[in-house]
Amino acid sequence: MPTIQQLVRKGRATFLKKGKAPALDSCPQKRGVCVRVYTTTPKKPNSAMRKVARVRLTNSKEVNVYIPGEGHNLQEHSIVLVRGGRVKDLPGVRYHIVRGALDTAGVSGRMQRRSKYGAKFPKTGTGKTKAVPTKNKK
């Protein structure tokens, strides 16, 4: 334990908290260009082919970014919007692509949580149709 005189001379070291998405430079999102689009396998208990892209951001930093949803239209040189948010079973992937923004298409056929995947409200053919409840006959 330090003496009071040592604390007067030196003081206590304050630890700086490390950010979770340092490549975004304190911005909510950043634009970037896909350098490589590929699939990779997750960590041990899980099994899948996760869609990932290597993106060069406008601040010239390169990051690994997860592509959420089923199917995508991304390829090399696609312009994407990147937000923070890691993928727990993919080491080194700390960012997500925003679906439905810039060159990234929304998930087609998505009915629930559409705003998270950039899916528009599905259009019905003949105006507004109401579901008629059926009565149970005993």
Swiss-Prot record:
* Keyword match Zinc: no
GO molecular function, a single term: structural constituent of ribosome
**Pfam families hit by this protein:** Ribosom_S12_S23
Query: Which residues, renumbered to this chain, carry the PTM 3-methylthioaspartic acid?
Result: D89
Lineage: superkingdom:
Bacteria
Task: Tell me which GO cellular component terms the UniProt record holds.
Answer: small ribosomal subunit
Q: Which UniProt keywords apply?
A: Methylation, Ribonucleoprotein, Ribosomal protein, RNA-binding, rRNA-binding, tRNA-binding
SUPFAM superfamilies linked to this entry: Nucleic acid-binding proteins
**PROSITE patterns per record:** RIBOSOMAL_S12 (PS00055)
Q: Name one GO biological process term.
A: translation
InterPro entries registered for this protein in UniProt:
NA-bd_OB-fold, Ribosomal_uS12, Ribosomal_uS12_bac
Q: Which residue intervals make up region (Disordered)?
A: 107-138
| Similarity comment | Belongs to the universal ribosomal protein uS12 family.
Write out the function statement from the record.
With S4 and S5 plays an important role in translational accuracy. Interacts with and stabilizes bases of the 16S rRNA that are involved in tRNA selection in the A site and with the mRNA backbone. Located at the interface of the 30S and 50S subunits, it traverses the body of the 30S subunit contacting proteins on the other side and probably holding the rRNA structure together. The combined cluster of proteins S8, S12 and S17 appears to hold together the shoulder and platform of the 30S subunit.
Protein name per Swiss-Prot or TrEMBL: Small ribosomal subunit protein uS12
Which species is listed as the source?
A: Azobacteroides pseudotrichonymphae genomovar. CFP2
Q: Which gene encodes it?
A: rpsL
